[in-house]
Amino acid sequence: MKKLYMIVDVQNDFVDGALGFEKAEDVVKQIVATLETKLEPEDVVVFTRDTHFENYLETQEGIRLPIPHCIHGTYGWEIVEALSPWIKTTTPIFDKPTFGSLELGNYLKTQNFDEIEIMGLVSNICVITNLPRLRKPHFRKLGLL
């Protein structure tokens, strides 16, 4: 059974940066524990990155949330170091300039996963907005951490 582990926006700015929050490090620890204990050789791990640019404050999101974060190429934009063991040169990483990722949706159309486990930060925005991209009739199970 082929399983996808989707890690959504686990970036420095959401842990200890501009939009960091107290429990973020606990979420990172749970994700690490899940990958260490559940990941099988046939499974796939993908990452998404919230991605903005220097003009962020001029964008629709920046006007509504005027806190620069996850600016492309900065420390805050990088995926947290704790997850680096699961990032290989072939690991799919989807940069998202908006809440969801069309590129991720297109990737999923080409794959045959039996299960998807989605984990990440800012669940009420970043994680949830990626769920519509996951609808495929053949998915047996969709887990949310």
Please place each PLM-identified region on the residue numbering.
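Short, glycine/serine-rich, charged loops/turns that create anion-binding
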Residues: 11-12, 52, 98, 123-125, ...
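Histidine-anchored nucleotide/phosphate-binding helix
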Residues: 32-37, 128-139
